[in-house]
């Protein structure tokens, strides 16, 4: 394969893995540890 193709594939994989990790952090088990500022300041 050409260098540009390998570079594009590696950047794409990195972007997909980062997006997957962000979604897991936002909606998976670690989301229970996130604080919600709207719940802290109810009127």
From Swiss-Prot:
Annotated TM spans: 5-27
Localization per Swiss-Prot or TrEMBL: Plastid, Chloroplast thylakoid membrane
Membrane topology: Single-pass membrane protein
Keyword Chloroplast: yes
GO cellular component: chloroplast thylakoid membrane
Pfam families: PsbN
Alphabetical UniProt keywords: Chloroplast, Membrane, Plastid, Thylakoid, Transmembrane, Transmembrane helix
InterPro entries the record matches: PSII_PsbN
Top-level taxon of origin: Eukaryota
A single BP term in Gene Ontology: photosynthesis
Cited function: May play a role in photosystem I and II biogenesis.
Family note: Belongs to the PsbN family.
PANTHER family (UniProt xref): PROTEIN PSBN
Name this polypeptide is given: Protein PsbN
Protein's organism: Thuja plicata (Western red-cedar)
Gene symbol of the encoding locus: psbN
